[in-house]
């Protein structure tokens, strides 16, 4: 006999799946949507209650999207199978939010670039540096994660940045890095790294178009600030 409580064990009018069929997915709470994905609860706790606890223990949806396997399996009742479902759902959501007609995406403003990386980078617990590669028409031809750690001009080497740009025959690049604090205000080191990479790009004939600093749902463009 199985001890796991399933959605079907709930009263019919409380079953998330039945409510979704009847009222549409938009009528379900976050816990109910997660319950539909996970399917079964645990001994003594139905899936809606477990889902609600998972969301709360991770600090809400933003925490869900930025937690890892270790974070999830540390929650009572969440094994690797359930954690894998949540991680897959979160990753698919991130990719969908950044999807812009595949390769046919033109960067016309800092906002256009920020859309591509915001959902992935806004809640990262470490600093990540990404480079968006553009062709002569400002179309995106690639996005590469080139560095993890605190941005420092003595550590961030132009070789890693421009290796991918040269390999992809990029005409220009946009740098993007996050501040785990959520505050995108540029530090002196951010500015120093930017100037150094700009000079290197000029020597190589690859323009550094902008450097975006990503915070929690907000960003700063060094170009718009007149720094670049």
UniProtKB/Swiss-Prot annotation:
One of its GO terms (molecular function) is metal ion binding. The keyword Protease applies. GO terms for biological process: proteolysis. It holds the Pfam family UPF0758_N. A motif (JAMM motif) lies at residues 177-190. Gene3D superfamilies: Cytidine Deaminase, domain 2 (3.40.140.10). Zn(2+) binds at residues 177, 179, 190. The keyword Heme does not apply. Residues 106-228 form the MPN domain. InterPro entries: MPN, RadC_JAB, RuvA_2-like, UPF0758, UPF0758_CS, UPF0758_N. Keywords: Hydrolase, Metal-binding, Metalloprotease, Protease, Zinc. Belongs to the UPF0758 family. This is UPF0758 protein CKL_0865.
